[in-house]
Amino acid sequence: MDVLHAHDLYDEQLIDRVGDAVNEDAGDDLDTLVDGQQQQQRVGFNRQMDILLDAPQEPPLGVFPAQGGPNGPPRLRKKRSFYTMTKPTPPCQSQEPEMCLLMASVTRAMRHVREDQRGEYFANYLVENMTSQNYPNGVGLPQHWGQL
């Protein structure tokens, strides 16, 4: 086997020398060296193309930055939940809550009182003003719990 291999190597050298003689070359293999340098330069210029041609048939990662690439590892998309999605509120919910006339007048009057006296003022105002004289037949008083 070794003899056969050595014989093939000798034949290749002989063919190279014959090629030099045919081309009227000096036999210094300068043309082979130049061809090798040109081949190396071609490989350097087309390295990216060679990588792409040798790659499996998949798109490069740079095309889809979400899959990874220069910005870092891929990010998982947040899965939306029906309960956490914000929805536009109807205009009736964005307004102030329903309030009876008595409560509206109490809050208006309490704006002029200091904060430490507001609780006492609130109770006194209701006792003084929640009378049948001010609200005949209960008109303007709270009709159900939570309205006051």
Curated annotation (Swiss-Prot):
GO terms for biological process: sperm individualization. Residues 56-78 are annotated as: Disordered. The gene is soti. Belongs to the male-specific scotti family. Post-meiotically transcribed gene that has a role in late spermiogenesis; required for actin cone progression during spermatid individualization. InterPro entries: Soti. It holds the Pfam family SOTI. Glycans are attached at N129. This is Male-specific protein scotti. The keyword Glycoprotein applies. Keywords: Developmental protein, Differentiation, Glycoprotein, Spermatogenesis.
